[in-house]
Every structure is written in structure tokens, then in C-alpha cells.
Design a protein with these regions (language model features):
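C-terminal/domain-edge helix-coil "capping" segments
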Residues: 18-30, 113-115, 122-131, 135-173
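A short, structured loop/turn motif at beta-sheet edges
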Residues: 32-36, 69-75, 120-127
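Surface-exposed short loop/turn segments
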Residues: 65, 80-131, 161
């Protein structure tokens, strides 16, 4: 009896740290496969390690999909990341760009929103072939821990941009 009670209490205490993670993906671009060669937009000299890591994760994912990384390529890949308190609403004038998130019941820490953005442009004419962002709310996970999931979602979406969608995975909140 005590053992069962201990397991229930342990499960309840861990419920705030892990569970379903919602990944919000929004994208636009060409609807046909655009695999080819790509080069990376240069990062600022003082770039955070997380940005360099995000870029490396995206390169790895694109290589597995048949893209080719080159110093002089047909396409330019630009990568960005952000980290903000999730309860803040981001606006441009009256337009809400990112609504604030309300805490969940029994939540013991404040959420942060981690976001990765990518843009793939054709170098010859500057045409945008793909633009996408993936974001997640986390209470305990760090930006670094979240980057692999965000990169995976964007790489999976790059050849089939479909506007906004919501995907769910299990992981560290």
C-alpha cells in the first residue's frame, strides 16, 4: 500500500517536468521539392553557441534529406533563434505577433518560448523558397535541449510548407 502511494506521489511530482510538448510550426514557400545545394548565411562574430548549434543541426538534417552543403551554392540558408518569457505578448502596433501564454494549473515555474526560424532563398534572384519557424513553450528544458526538436520539425516541413500547424511530442517540459 505504501509502495503504491509512493509511486502515485512520485508520478504527480514528476508530472510538472515532463509530458506532451506542443510544437507550433508555421511556414510558407514553394510546394515542390527544392533539394539542391545550399550555403549558410554568415553568423555574426559574437554569435551565441546555441545559434551555431542550431545551424549545425539544420545542416545535418538537410544533408540527410539529399541537400548538399557548398561554399558557393544555389540557395542561401539563414538561421535565427530566440528565447523569451512566454507570458509576454509580442505586438507590432495593434497586431499580435505572438500571444502571451497563461501558466498551466499546478505549474511551479515560468514558461519560456524557444523559437527557431529559417529562410531558404535562391541566390540568383533573391526569391524566397521557404520561410518557416518552429516554437515550443518550456518550463524546465533549456534552449539548447529544445533545438534538436525544433530543427527536426523544420527540416521535415521544408519541402511541404503548409502554413500553421501544431505537432505534439513527449519530452521534458
Amino acid at each position: 500500500m505504501r509502495g503504491a502511494l509512493a509511486l502515485v506521489l512520485l508520478g504527480l511530482s514528476m508530472a510538472g517536468c515532463s509530458g506532451p510538448i506542443e510544437t507550433r510550426v508555421s511556414s510558407a514557400g514553394e510546394e515542390q521539392p527544392i533539394a539542391g545545394s545550399f550555403m549558410l548565411a554568415p553568423l555574426p562574430d559574437n554569435s551565441a553557441d546555441e545559434l551555431t548549434g542550431a545551424q549545425a543541426l539544420l545542416v545535418e538534417g538537410l544533408l540527410t534529406k539529399g541537400y548538399h552543403h557548398a561554399d558557393d551554392a544555389d540557395m542561401m540558408l539563414t538561421v535565427g533563434i530566440s528565447d523569451r518569457p512566454a507570458q509576454l505578448t509580442v505586438k507590432n502596433g495593434a497586431q499580435i505577433l505572438a500571444p502571451g501564454k497563461q501558466p498551466k494549473m499546478w505549474q511551479s515555474c515560468a514558461d519560456r518560448e524557444y523559437r527557431m526560424t529559417i529562410e531558404l532563398t535562391r541566390r540568383a534572384d533573391g526569391a524566397q523558397l521557404y520561410s518557416g519557424n518552429a516554437s515550443e513553450y518550456h518550463c524546465n528544458a533549456t534552449l539548447t535541449e529544445t533545438l534538436p526538436s525544433l530543427a527536426k520539425r523544420l527540416v521535415a516541413d521544408i519541402e511541404r510548407p503548409r502554413g500553421p500547424k501544431l505537432l505534439v511530442r513527449l519530452g521534458k517540459d
